[in-house]
Amino acid sequence: MNSAVPGTTHDDIAALTPARARERFRAGERVATSGWCPGFTQANLIAVPQQYAYDVLLFTQRNPKACPVIDVTDAGSVEPGIAPGADLRTDLPGYRVYEEGRLVAETGDAREHWREDMVAFLIGCSFTFERALLESGVPVRHLTAGTNVPMYRTNRACRPAGRLHGPMVVSMRAVPADQVAAAVQVTSRFPSMHGAPVHVGDPAALGIEDLAWPDYGDAPVLADGDVPVFWACGVTPQAVIAAVGIPYAVSHAPGQMFISDVPEATWALA
């Protein structure tokens, strides 16, 4: 779903502070956040009842490529350390609600779905390193096209943890063949934002049957000479929840991230 304010341009969203962006989402704007507030950290969200929090924490520790945790709330808290004063129930553009592993609701306001004992995990997002890609001369096709990044469930199993198991999800960016090495080099500096790609080239090697039909996000944009490059993705917990049927969870809508106050440089290796 895309309901950006009419007349909003890329320059407008790039100039926003994270706090102002969160205000707009709180007011009901629903949009993919690639290109928003460049220079600041974006994060995936997965929130579960406290009885499942240790399973999720263990899962993220065993699968840091897909689930690099950058913040965890206390049970019942909706204010993350990476954005003091923010409210995780309202300050993302979109949310998904899962019951017994089934998607039961999509909303722009999660307050009525947020239980008192929820523990929220914020997981680094690859949108954070897109500015660095652009600055190095690597095009970001979905950003130019104004679409959401395509994401795919793969045949790569994550390491099980407690009651959790399931497939890795990846995001895909089409990169000119002569710039793949640069894309790998740039993104490897951001291990807390998924780091270097997990695969370059043939989608079938990841069990992806048709690149044109992603499981999440929008259809890919490719130019002549592009190579598909795949990064581990923070939507992985949603695929895991669907696989194991966790009784209850709230997540971000894929591509509609939490924008924090933390500069991207915080996570960049020298």
From Swiss-Prot:
What Gene3D superfamilies does the record tag this protein with?
PSTPO5379-like, PSTPO5379-like domain
Keyword line: Lyase
What start-end ranges are recorded for coiled-coil regions in this protein? Answer: none
What InterPro entries does the entry give? Answer: D-Glu_cyclase (IPR009906), Putative_hydro-lyase (IPR038021), UPF0317 (IPR016938)
A Pfam family this chain is assigned to: D-Glu_cyclase
Enzyme class label? lyase
This chain's protein is named Putative hydro-lyase Noca_0093
